[in-house]
A protein has these predicted regions:
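Extracytoplasmic
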Residues: 15-49, 70
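Conserved MFS/SLC helix-loop-helix module at the cytosolic interface between two early adjacent transmembrane helices
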Residues: 65-104
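Cytoplasmic helix-loop-helix junction between adjacent transmembrane helices
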Residues: 109-141
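Helical-face signature of the major facilitator-like transporter fold
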Residues: 23-28, 60, 94, 102-114
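Residue-level signature of mid-helix packing/kink "hotspots" within the transmembrane helices
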Residues: 32, 60-68, 118
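Juxtamembrane helix-start elements in MFS-like secondary transporters
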Residues: 48-56
Length: 141
């Protein structure tokens, strides 16, 4: 016995999935950005290795802290809204980090980025379970 599911058109479903996957990919970029920019960050903010590591770690602190709340919030408000919010906040965090006049603002930007890209993976999987046919879930995951 098979259960029929009403899913949106494939192009729309994969487009929305791509949005979440794009945010997840952006998260990987932001994880390694301080390693690539270590010289520039050290010179611009006068950082030693410890301070640079702390600046980089702010991303991971907020990323980890948002993992469980992300699932709960996605169940309450829906993954699409949460994903859009994550994209907006990560964009604001990236702009703040790029234009930061001091270490405080750079750290706040990193913290916002980490917390907001944390929604990417959870929301993408949740959208895939609802929007894609069951046979295609393993491809989307």
């Amino acid at each position: 016995m098979s259960i029929l599911r009403n899913t949106p058109p494939a192009a729309l479903a994969w487009s929305v999935w791509g949005l979440g996957a794009g945010l997840f990919l952006l998260g990987f970029f932001h994880r390694v950005a301080p390693a690539v920019l270590h010289r520039e960050l050290s010179v611009d903010f006068g950082l030693n290795a410890t301070s640079l590591g702390s600046l980089s770690a702010l991303y991971f602190y907020s990323y980890v802290a948002m993992q469980i709340p992300t699932g709960l919030i996605a169940d309450r408000v829906g993954p699409r809204r949460l994903l859009i919010g994550g994209i907006i906040i990560s964009t604001l965090g990236a702009i703040l980090f790029a234009l930061a006049p001091s270490l405080f603002w750079a750290g706040l930007g990193r913290f916002l980025i980490g917390g907001s890209v944390a929604v990417g993976f959870v929301c993408t999987l949740k959208l895939a379970t609802h929007w894609l046919p069951t046979e295609q879930f393993s491809l989307a995951a």
